[in-house]
């Protein structure tokens, strides 16, 4: 018995990608952008095929990501942001809605929207996940986007 195995490759050559980035906690968000751009370049993509959309906060990421996906200009969207827990329930609400909204936007548009939103307990954890001790989640999200576009192309 032979079962066909289909998976995406990691070539971004010719791929058009939108990065949607929240400005809140921008000093960390910019590191996520740098990680994503680095990943796309390392896998054959070019800056000419990328666009960066900046929105106020993580709550707006799903709306802007969906709009970019529906534009027909992009093969994938990468949503990047930073949500750090504070002393109120605001963190839980924003983290849940951003996560749910990004997933819903991807399902509704059938365009891969990679989730690169940090949800951390404190500033130190966010910094670690934006390029220091724990890798760069922007880089990881870009890898997901690239792989998903190539998987979709084989379906």
From Swiss-Prot:
GO molecular function: 6,7-dimethyl-8-ribityllumazine synthase activity
CDD domains attached to this UniProt entry: Lumazine_synthase-I
Binding site for (2S)-2-hydroxy-3-oxobutyl phosphate: 87-88, 129
Enzyme class at the top of the EC tree: transferase
UniProt-annotated catalytic positions: 90
Highest rank taxon of the organism: Bacteria
Catalytic reactions on record: (2S)-2-hydroxy-3-oxobutyl phosphate + 5-amino-6-(D-ribitylamino)uracil = 6,7-dimethyl-8-(1-D-ribityl)lumazine + phosphate + 2 H2O + H(+)
Keywords: Riboflavin biosynthesis, Transferase
Transferase recorded as keyword: yes
E.C. number(s) listed in UniProt: 2.5.1.78
InterPro entries in alphabetical order: LS (IPR034964), LS/RS (IPR002180), LS/RS_sf (IPR036467)
An annotated GO cellular component: riboflavin synthase complex
Transferase is among the record's keywords: yes
SUPFAM superfamilies (alphabetical): Lumazine synthase
NCBIfam families membership: lumazine-synth, PRK00061.1-4
Family indicated by similarity: Belongs to the DMRL synthase family.
UniProt xrefs under PANTHER family: 6,7-DIMETHYL-8-RIBITYLLUMAZINE SYNTHASE (PTHR21058:SF0), 6,7-DIMETHYL-8-RIBITYLLUMAZINE SYNTHASE DMRL SYNTHASE LUMAZINE SYNTHASE (PTHR21058)
Job of this protein: Catalyzes the formation of 6,7-dimethyl-8-ribityllumazine by condensation of 5-amino-6-(D-ribitylamino)uracil with 3,4-dihydroxy-2-butanone 4-phosphate. This is the penultimate step in the biosynthesis of riboflavin.
HAMAP family with a match to the protein in the record: Lumazine_synth
Protein name listed in UniProt: 6,7-dimethyl-8-ribityllumazine synthase
Source species of the chain: Chlorobium chlorochromatii (strain CaD3)
């Amino acid at each position: 018995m032979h079962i066909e195995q289909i998976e995406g490759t990691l070539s971004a050559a010719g791929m058009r990608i939108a990065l949607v980035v929240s400005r809140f906690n921008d000093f960390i968000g910019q590191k996520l952008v740098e990680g994503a751009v680095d990943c796309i370049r390392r896998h054959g993509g070019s800056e000419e095929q990328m666009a960066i959309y900046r929105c106020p906060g993580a709550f707006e990421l799903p709306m802007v990501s969906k709009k970019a996906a529906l534009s027909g200009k992009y093969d994938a969207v990468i949503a990047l942001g930073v949500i750090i827990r504070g002393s109120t329930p605001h963190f839980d609400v924003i983290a849940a809605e951003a996560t749910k909204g990004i997933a819903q936007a991807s399902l509704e548009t059938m365009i891969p929207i990679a989730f690169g939103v940090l949800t951390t307990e404190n500033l130190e954890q966010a910094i670690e996940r934006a390029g220091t001790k724990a890798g760069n989640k922007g880089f990881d999200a870009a890898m997901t986007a690239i792989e998903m576009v190539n998987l979709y192309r084989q379906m």
